[in-house]
Curated annotation (Swiss-Prot):
Residue positions binding ATP: G39, V40, T41, G42, S43, G44, K45, T46
Source species of the chain: Aliivibrio fischeri (strain ATCC 700601 / ES114)
Family: Belongs to the UvrB family.
Location (main, coarse): cytoplasm
Subcellular location: Cytoplasm
Biological role: The UvrABC repair system catalyzes the recognition and processing of DNA lesions. A damage recognition complex composed of 2 UvrA and 2 UvrB subunits scans DNA for abnormalities. Upon binding of the UvrA(2)B(2) complex to a putative damaged site, the DNA wraps around one UvrB monomer. DNA wrap is dependent on ATP binding by UvrB and probably causes local melting of the DNA helix, facilitating insertion of UvrB beta-hairpin between the DNA strands. Then UvrB probes one DNA strand for the presence of a lesion.
UniProt gene name: uvrB
GO molecular function (one): ATP hydrolysis activity
Classification via InterPro entries: Helicase/UvrB_N, Helicase_ATP-bd, Helicase_C-like, P-loop_NTPase, UVR_dom, UVR_dom_sf, UvrB, UvrB_inter
Name of the featured protein: UvrABC system protein B
Record GO biological process: nucleotide-excision repair; SOS response
Amino acid sequence: MSSAYELVSNYQPAGDQPQAIKTLNEGLENGLAHQTLLGVTGSGKTFTLANVIAHSGRPTIIMAHNKTLAAQLYGEMKAFFPNNAVEYFVSYFDYYQPEAYVPTTDTFIEKDSSVNEHIEQMRLSATKALLERKDAIIIASVSAIYGLGDPKAYLSMILHLRRGDIINQRDMLRRLAELQYKRNDMAFERGTFRVRGEVLDIFPAESEHEAIRIEMFDDEVERISKFDPLTGSIITKDMPRCTIYPKTHYVTPREQVLDAIEKIKVDLAIRQKELLENNKLVEEQRITQRTQFDIEMMNELGFCSGIENYSRYLSGRPEGEAPPTLFDYLPQDGLLIIDESHITVSQIGAMYKGDRSRKENLVEYGFRLPSALDNRPLRFEEFEALAPQTIYVSATPGKYEIEKSDGEIAEQVVRPTGLLDPVIEVRPVATQVDDLLSEIRIRTKNNERVLVTTLTKRMAEDLTEYLDEHGVKVRYLHSDIDTVERVEIIRDLRLGEFDVLVGINLLREGLDMPEVSLVAILDADKEGFLRSERSLIQTIGRAARNLEGKAILYADKITGSMEKAIGETERRREKQQLHNETLGIVPQALKKDVADILELGDMTKNKRKVVAPKIKLSEVAEEGASYSAMSPQQLEKAIQKLESKMYQHAKDLEFEQAAQVRDEIDNLRKQFIVNS
């Protein structure tokens, strides 16, 4: 079967990978709606999925439960498919304060947000890839279930230009303005155009390093070319055609806006009557004033602040209908993969209710029309109805995934490296701290690392202090630490800056540390969320990448969760040992460069034809890395300053210096995603 994908890898499927790939491919070909890949830590689940995607040849959305994991997957998939469209679709807000009203204190909180332009460009690039290509892999967060512009309206606004077309230049500029592009003859940046005589330059909103040049001869399109907006060098000369996509997903034709205004007026009159009948005079005055102001803005400018609350009218949807989302851009033969499904599935289910309760207050107290309730994420049942063929991926699949898969579970227990699951020991609670200290000393002599998980913040702090007093190099990882500092701490642990990391609920999914040979779980017999079967298996799995991996559970009794977790780990270990003995495999230690923890994939790879001098990325926790400790807001300001500097160099014809600054900006943008 020929595929649109080209999988690039030095490895061949090994261990349980070939069987898992075969099972999943057969399931897809047989039309199974739901399948589950049960893959243990370090078994190469991403490589298995890459093989399944390559074999299927279908456009794919991979959903992750947070931006950090999404960025990690983006980097891995980008490495496997360097010649295909691997895109990144997460929330583009650096900061977002939603509109809200607190009745008890009569406090109205205005919407406040800060949009990251680079991520907005990547989102536009993602939807463009889905609309244009079969070989599109979109790495998305739960942002994918939130309302996006209607794909029909979006497609209807696209500007197609062909060589030889007869079109008046002013008409072309008017069309660009409708797509929300702005004219800027001085600073040529994303989402703008400039005019020089009969030459029109357009910087597409979804592009990072390529702009379009339209050369006219009177009213005829004489030549279309693609060029580097920084240096001006031609990338592709004399193209037969080009397509200009809108600057935003939320663009709407003028006729639809005018039609929406009439519908808003009708609903406003109905709402005014309801409020007056219930003697809510303040609320009636409030909704009248706010809505009429919005109508005036839409009439004059085509949009208003908070226009998303009128999305139902703009897209022509009936009341209560699901909003258009990223899934509406996915072709019918698309594929959905949900990573760490035991968390992501429940996260998808939780989004709707939290959003609904906040909006109900706004509607009840006259800040918004009832139509605002339809600007929402998908309900879980709507998500289920929209989702194409789905593969759930987890080391500990939840009840939902197992039921949906109806026994269609591909097991990936045997690792290609031959590494075994950790040995598990249960020891008494009474001497847990002293026993732990002696175990730590054994590990530090062998230059190995230790993870310790406690039940409470207080205990984690006390234990950290106690170990520190006894000469142990220890750090404490807690929920107040932001993403970038967390990555920095993990990197320092791997480098040996300290030997023991103490935490509560942060030592589970997505931590890849081959140096960790011991995981200690204190108070393992206290049943609850942090000591459930799934949590225990995930935590024990942190020691599964080391040859000497061991997990010690401190408990006075064996709980049901402990029994199941120990039983499952031993079952996997036996299967792994049998496989190694049968094939004569000697377990190999996993070697992974410490720098790899921060790799997000080269976001500009294969997008740029112009070769420029390389500038080293300022990696998080790197000595002297001035940008690594910055907040996303500070990084955004630094990027803006560098962009001004870059344009000044270009203006002064200092193209080498401009290219160097451009590369530094690219690196900062990668840093930005880590820090977000």
